[in-house]
From Swiss-Prot:
Family: Belongs to the glutaredoxin family.
Domain Glutaredoxin: 6-106
Disulfide bonds: C26-C29
Gene Ontology cellular component annotations, sorted alphabetically: cytoplasm; mitochondrion; nucleus
Keywords per UniProt: Disulfide bond, Electron transport, Redox-active center, Transport
Annotated organism of origin: Schizosaccharomyces pombe (strain 972 / ATCC 24843)
The name this protein goes by in its record: Glutaredoxin-2
Source domain of life: Eukaryota
One Gene Ontology term of the molecular function aspect: glutathione disulfide oxidoreductase activity
Function (record text): The disulfide bond functions as an electron carrier in the glutathione-dependent synthesis of deoxyribonucleotides by the enzyme ribonucleotide reductase. In addition, it is also involved in reducing some disulfides in a coupled system with glutathione reductase. Thioltransferase catalyzes cellular thiol-disulfide transhydrogenation reactions. It transfers reducing equivalents to cytosolic protein and nonprotein disulfides.
InterPro entries the UniProt entry points to: GLR_AS (IPR011767), Glutaredoxin (IPR002109), Glutaredoxin_euk/vir (IPR011899), Glutaredoxin_subgr (IPR014025), Thioredoxin-like_sf (IPR036249)
Length: 110
């Protein structure tokens, strides 16, 4: 893990309302991004298999979140988990509320 990876992750989750660290070939990542798109969530995805230092970024995410798999999803600066966690939020109705809150406060987080 490098300080470059840490800086990249921290900047990404600070600058985006919703951040998804993903891999382009991962079906769980695709499902999570599809869910966020369906709910019109203002998200930014980073494909770790396509960017420089992707493995270092994933190592830092593991250190930060204790989750070794992708997707790693953040709402504002809060880690919410992976695709199964996103589906739990969707099923409970919480996801809709979280996205509405993000959109209402968009100017303060963008």
């Amino acid at each position: 893990m490098t300080s470059i990876a840490k800086a990249f992750v921290e900047k990404a989750i600070s600058n985006n309302p919703v951040t998804v660290f993903s891999k382009s070939f991962c079906p769980f990542c695709k499902a999570a991004k599809n869910t966020l798109t369906k709910y019109s969530a203002p998200y930014k995805a980073y494909e770790l298999d396509k960017i420089e230092n992707g493995s270092d970024i994933q190592a830092y995410l593991h250190e930060k979140t204790k989750q070794s798999t992708v997707p790693s999803i953040f709402f504002r600066n809060q880690f919410i988990g992976g695709n199964s966690d996103l589906n739990k939020l969707r099923s409970s109705g919480t996801l809709t509320k979280m996205i509405a809150e993000l959109k209402e406060n968009k100017s303060s987080i963008l």
